[in-house]
Amino acid sequence: MRFRFVCRCPGRGLICFMLLLAVCALSGGCGERGAVEVDDPGSLPEPTAANVIPEPTAASVIPEPTATSVIPEPTAASVIYEPGKTLEERFLVPDGYGRKKREQGTLTAFLREYPLKKAGKPVLLFDGSRKGNQSAHAAVCRLPIENEDLQQCADSIMRVYAEFFWQTKQFEKISFSLGGGFQADYNKWRQGYTIRVSGDTAQWVPSSASDGSYQSLKKYLRLVFAYSGTATMEGETKKIAREDIRVGDVFIKGGSPGHVVMVVDVCEREDGAKAFLLAQGYMPAQEFHVLKNPRHEQDPWYYEEEVEYPFETPEYTFDRGSLRRLVYNE
């Protein structure tokens, strides 16, 4: 479209022309196109650094979750609380299980409160050297051990019972078989007697060195350890079913060599199924220690449904009929 300017105002042509230019400017300029349409791509300005939205960069993109930012799933290792100083504090129960309330003065309470060495400590032999196999234990108990090769597997369990009965003043229950029908009653020892062994015969004889002190208890145990073992211990047990397992029970194979491990804690599910911890001494004489479970080494609990025979522990495999209860755990 073309405009033809005709001014009919005499003497005012310049003024009228200037007004016409102003009108054209307000209407988008002069020419055939008129105003620029915004939907006409040919009329959009070329992009510049100032008006382009920047592409996302590594710093501006929300990162994908990584292994360190994702909350880990619970694992079997979560049942071990390394700062724990006692059996109960160190070993948490598995999901779905709970410990029954422990009554003071019971073997369960005694063992749950039993002090442990710091996590990661090695098992030491009676002479202070390291045991060769350091991969079998989950914790080391602070059970006393003397500087001689006597307190081995059965002896360690007798030591646990003797310490418990002595501390709770149940002296009449400290009594162990030496074989051949001879029973080493600690109460008799406390009354001023000792045991004389000659060949296969043992008998009580008076002794001024025997009394009710703790030092005298250790002398009594030293003699018991020298003349007893898994064979005599097995004779003081009875078979039990796995669903009846409780603290103080044992898996035992009597003989020479034999072996025995002890149940030191038990927890239960609501349906009554149990899980338990095992501990042992061994030969040569060594510190009493909580065992790992070879089925899942990061979780030391043994589960009732896993008890099948042969029953495997880290350093010994037990046959059917080995789960038993000691007469002094009645």
Q: Which residues does each PLM region occupy?
A:
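Bacterial N-terminal signal peptides that target proteins for export
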Residues: 2-17
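Bacterial N-terminal signal peptides
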Residues: 16-27
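Bacterial signal peptide processing site
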Residues: 29-33
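N-terminal module-boundary/linker segments of secreted carbohydrate-active enzymes
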Residues: 34-46, 73-133, 147-152
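Intrinsically disordered, low-complexity proline-rich tandem-repeat tracts
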Residues: 45-47, 54-56, 63-65, 72-74
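Extracellular-facing segments of soluble proteins and assemblies that are Gly/Ser/Thr-biased and enriched
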Residues: 146-238
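...with weaker cross-activation on analogous glycine-rich loops/strands in unrelated enzymes
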Residues: 214-272
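Low-complexity, Gly/Ser/Thr/Pro-rich intrinsically disordered linker/tail segments
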Residues: 274-330
